[in-house]
Amino acid sequence: MGEFGEVTLGVAQAAPVYFDREASTEKARGLIREAGEKGVDLLAFGETWLTGYPYWKDAPWSREYNDLRARYVANGVMIPGPETDALCQAAAEAGVDVAIGVVELEPGSLSSVYCTLLFISREGEILGRHRKLKPTDSERRYWSEGDATGLRVYERPYGRLSGLNCWEHLMMLPGYALAAQGTQFHVAAWPNMASSASELLSRAYAYQAGCYVLCAGGLGPAPGELPDGIAAESLDHLTGESCIIDPWGKVIAGPVSCEETLITARVSTASIYRRKSLTDVGGHYSRPDVFRFEVDRSERPRVVFRDGDVDDRG
């Protein structure tokens, strides 16, 4: 006989240490440790938390701007690499599953980065990663486009886990691809949750997919820690506003504004089954005879050499 389970969800709302991946990694390890001490089963961080969202991306072009971009790319994180090894160790020691936004450095060129959502198990293993499919507006000054290899759910002891970055929730089809795989716990990684659109899209996805949504919003550095050439106004929207949403679209924890904190909620899987039994858009509430949807999850290497070798470093 199947039984409903209980799960403790957590969102780490904190600012990274900009342009310092080692210090940011140590801060993340501390937050993972704290989550473990509080009995959290799944911990979410915001979009590109390691090593930070490029909040100055809309600034006018200048030498300082270009220098910041170069430093940003140089602080990208290899997957796998020393930083992810350290995060895996922390997750294993704390017994916590982790979903963390990462500025992922492409190992092939060493000069391109992705907006990546990295999934780590409580056993200390990398479950997978999802590279943002379409960077939004001026984010394209920084991030490359990802493919669909990571558009999948992960079987965990408490249920099925998935995640998307920011306005991927607006694209609809990526979210449906995850709903069709039966997602039950979904991480919505945002640079912030301050806009009404962020909350609207996150609550809508929770209701449509019938899953819990961990909305992880980011914080920027303190005004006194701003890099040269960047105005304080750039930080106005990085106020966090992280929250946790139930399968009926109701906010059950948070939001919290402008404060470093760990937001938690103890939830039951019963709400997932009650919601999906009514309208399961990836199952009985769909019409595959009318609509056909195909996702190409094959890898897209940048280079295939004539001798047959594939440059799979990226």
UniProtKB/Swiss-Prot annotation:
Domain (CN hydrolase) ranges: 7-269
Enzyme class: hydrolase
EC code(s) of this entry: 3.5.5.1
Gene Ontology terms for molecular function: nitrilase activity
Keywords assigned: Hydrolase
Record: active site: 47, 132, 166
Reactions performed catalytically: a nitrile + 2 H2O = a carboxylate + NH4(+)
Similarity comment: family membership: Belongs to the carbon-nitrogen hydrolase superfamily. Nitrilase family.
Main function: Nitrilases catalyze the mild hydrolytic conversion of organonitriles directly to the corresponding carboxylic acids. Catalyzes the production of aryllactic acid derivatives. Mediates the hydrolysis of cyanohydrin to (S)-phenyllactic acid.
Protein name: Nitrilase 2
Organism taxonomic ancestry: Bacteria, environmental samples
